[in-house]
Amino acid sequence: HYDVEFHSFTNSTLIDEDFCKECVRVGNLSFSLSLEGFEESNDSRRGAGHFDAAMRAMDLMNQYGLIYGTSVCYTRANLETVLSDEFLDLEVEKGCMFSWYFHFMPTGTGASPELMPTPEQRKYIIKRIREIRANEGGKMIYTMDFQNDGEFVGGCIAGGRNYFHINSNGDAEPCVFIHYSNVNIKDHTLLEILQSPLFM
């Protein structure tokens, strides 16, 4: 499928030199690496050593000329950090071309609703993302706010319109947030998936 772009969201822990070489060979992959602040705040949610693994992965991907950025889950606790000049400068220094921002959504057993951003923080991110993207005074990284930037992609792109999600089991889902599937990438071609009732 060389005429299709594939984008993967990853925790980056399995990215090594062999992986990067294979990505260069294939040529149609880009990546969003999970990152939720500097080492302390990131590793408190992602696990000890994750921050260092993400930094190593970025260095390797940069060395091989791959296209990558970050996927940032912002919470009440880390919002100021992940929108700070210092954090954005680190991303730029590490070769990130973009940064997706998703607000924390508590789900499942043991959910932590106290981490949801406040209404004031939700307003602030809209303003701050636009400051970062500005031609004057902005940063050399393209930032997108998943919940508030629909105007730039024509609204929701899911359901096969421009995008669908493949989970870790290979199930094709309309969206990363909608866990329904009637087809699996192991048993169906991409065209068959897009022609299945869930995507039509």
Language model region names:
Residues 77-79, 98-119, 142-155, 179-182:
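Flexible glycine/acidic-rich beta-alpha junction loops that bind and position SAM and/or redox cofactors
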Residues 4, 50-55, 68-78, 107-142:
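Short acidic, glycine/proline-enriched helix-loop-strand junctions
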Residues 157-161:
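Short, small/polar residue-rich loop motifs at catalytic or cofactor-binding pockets
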Residues 1-102:
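Radical SAM/AdoMet-radical enzyme domain recognition
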Residues 120-151, 176-200:
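C-terminal accessory region of radical SAM enzymes
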Residues 93, 166-167:
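Short, acidic, Ser/Thr-enriched surface-loop or helix-capping motifs
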Residues 9, 35, 175, 183-184:
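Active-site-adjacent beta-strand anchor residues
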